[in-house]
Every structure is written in structure tokens, then in C-alpha cells.
Amino acid sequence: MIFDEIVNDAYEEREYPALLALAHEWSGTRPFRALRLLVATPVFRNTLLEYRALIAGGADLVVGVAGLDSGEEGAGADASNAGAGMPCDPGIVDVVRENGIPVVGLQEALEMEAAGRGFDLILDCAGQFSACHPRFGFVELTRSGVQFYEKCEHPVYVADSGIVKRIETCLGTGEGYVRALAQLGHDFCSDSGADGAGKEFVVFGSGKVGQGIVLQLLRSGASVHVVTDCSLGSNPFLDANGVPVTDCNDLDAVASLVRGADFVVTATGVKGALDRPQVVEALLGSHAVLANMGVEDEYGPGVPTSRVLAEKKPLNFILEEPTHLKYIDASLALHAALGELLLQEGGAVYGKEGADSPAANKKAGPMDPPSELEQRILSMTMQDGLIGAEIAEMMGW
């Protein structure tokens, strides 16, 4: 299989049971045969496993990287900033090209469409290629990308809408934040045995990513305080772990927390979430180590890029592997499998049969993944992977 040397040197098969199962299945069924697929998953070593499964299924693969070319503003106001500056590993981008797979930015993708060489399906991330017009629709990997598809005329499955994505965000992303801090010298939360007790963390956001960060920090022995929108109701996870919570609209209290923090990390998924004068002033006057774990700049323009680790990009992307493959395998498998489902629903089982218009039997715009498909991928991950016990703990089983 393509990329075998890199994959076999870096991973054991139990780290990617779901993608391995899809690759084996699709090598026989070839659901993507003669179809052009653009995949915009952030390009890192573990992403090669998703490419490999799709290629096994017969896909004519094109890899998309936002910002690769200039002139992105021509895509239109709604999509022009989607996924801007999405991190990638330049070395892996080179590997992809060396294996004969085209790598394009948004402008080149639009030019391909204009020249009659458009895409049958786009597996997107953070709405990077939402300005395109794939025949059978999109699959969006992240919650932050959904905003770019709210008025989309094509069907859009959102891989972040269900249970599978919790494996990546609750277990993998939080662990990636901790690893990144350790790589930068904050060894209190690495596997070195150092203790995080006494370090004060303020986590903005209590969704899947925020909860995952809190979980990892609690395991390290750190003191954690969460800032979130309390009008949304109580959070069972935070309540069960005795994590103190402050409402994001109580600006005096938030500013006080920031001033006393050793570390501040954002995980709200909202651009400019901390862009309040009182909070910005507290951040600029604080000694805290600032980091962002969202795709968007959650600090806003009032906080200089240089004041935040990794220049406001998601901190785990400084790592060779931002999220360990064992935690992201199920998400990438769902991303790809939802693509197969769109083709089936649009009448394209093999080749390019089916209607010229996008999947007429499906509504346009964002849709949740079917629970049956998620359960299938979850079963693969728990039965054949390395993290079954961690998933069971996360789910409270």
C-alpha cells in the first residue's frame, strides 16, 4: 500500500484499527473508483492513513491546504477566511507530492472547477474549501467549520456532531496540549513524574476540547478553573470532578482569575471569545503562559500574536503528531466513511453514475452522522485498538 514505509515505521496496526478496516474493505469494494476527492484534513504523518484508505477505495485523490496559494480573497466573503493558516507539516506535504498526489490551495481548487475538473466529493476541515461545489457534497471534520456551511446548497455531513469525535477531542486534544507544554519545558505535566500541583490553570470553554484539557490537567495534579457560558446550564463532567466554574460574562471575576493564573488556555471555538477590554487588560498584565487550542484566534486583536504560544495557532500543532493516531483514527475513519455514505445517497456507488445535481434525496446544509455508522466505527476502535479502556472510562461505562 502507498506510504507503507512511513506508516509501518511509525505505527502498529492497533493504533489505527478503524482506518485499517476501511482500507481492507474498500480495496475490494472500490466505492470511490473514478471519483475525484479533495481531502483537506491538516497534513501530518497520521493523515497519511486517511489518504491510504481512500486511495485503496479507488479515489483520484487531491490534497487541499488552505492558504497554499495567493488570491484566496476571491472566494467570497463567507469563505475567504475559512481555515486560514491551517497548520501542516511541510515534510509530509513533500511526501504527498512525491507520491504523485496533487496538493492545492483554494484558488487552484476553484480554477480546477472552472476548467471542468471539479470534485465529486470534498472532505473538508474548518471550512477551508466551502466555496467549492462538489457534485455529491461535503464532509466537515470540525465544529468550527460548520459556520461556513449554514447556507450551503449541498449536503454536508459534520463528523464533529456525534460520539466518535469525543475520542479525539476529549482524549486526544487535551493530551496533545499537555505534550506540547512538556515539549516547551513545562515538564510538570509530562510523563516524567513531575507534579503539576500548585500550578493554576484557567481553561476557557467547557465543550469537548475544554473537557479533554481539564481531564488531562486534573490527572497531572494541576489546579483547574473553567470559564464558560453558565447560561447554557450545568456541566455534568465539571460537576462530577469538582471543577470550579466562572461565568464568562462576569468580567471582573474572569479578569481576576486571569491575573492569578500560571497558564491560560482557550478552547471555546469562538473567534475573539476573550476580546473584552477588561479581559484583554488582565491578559496583558498577567504572567500566565497563554495558549490557544482552537482553530480560530480566540484572544482577538488586542492580545499580540507574540504573547501567545505558537503565535495563536492550536498549540498541539507544534508537535510532530498533534494528536496521537490512536486518538484520531476513529475521527478520520468517520470523515472518510461519511464520504462513502454521501456517494451512496447521491446514487454514485461505482464510477460517476447518479444525478448531476448534489444528492437530491438529502437536505442541503449540515447534518449529523448516522448513529449506526458511528457505532460501527466505535466498535472497531474498542475491539481492535489500544484505547478501549480509555473510551470506556470517558463514556462512564
Regions inferred by a protein language model and the residue ranges of each:
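Glycine/serine-rich phosphate-binding loop and adjoining beta1-alpha1 elements at the start
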Residues: 1-32, 69-74, 81-88, 93-196
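Adenosine-phosphate binding glycine-rich loop
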Residues: 3-19, 44, 158-191, 289-397
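Glycine-rich adenosine-cofactor-binding loop
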Residues: 34-47, 189-218
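Histidine-anchored nucleotide/phosphate-binding helix
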Residues: 43-59
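NAD(P)-binding Rossmann-fold cofactor-contacting core
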Residues: 63-73, 85-92, 220-241
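A short, aliphatic-rich alpha-helical micro-motif
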Residues: 115-116, 196, 255-259, 283-284
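ADP-ribose/adenylate-binding Rossmann-like module
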Residues: 124, 135-144, 263-271, 276-308
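Adenosine-nucleotide cofactor-binding segment
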Residues: 222-259, 264-271
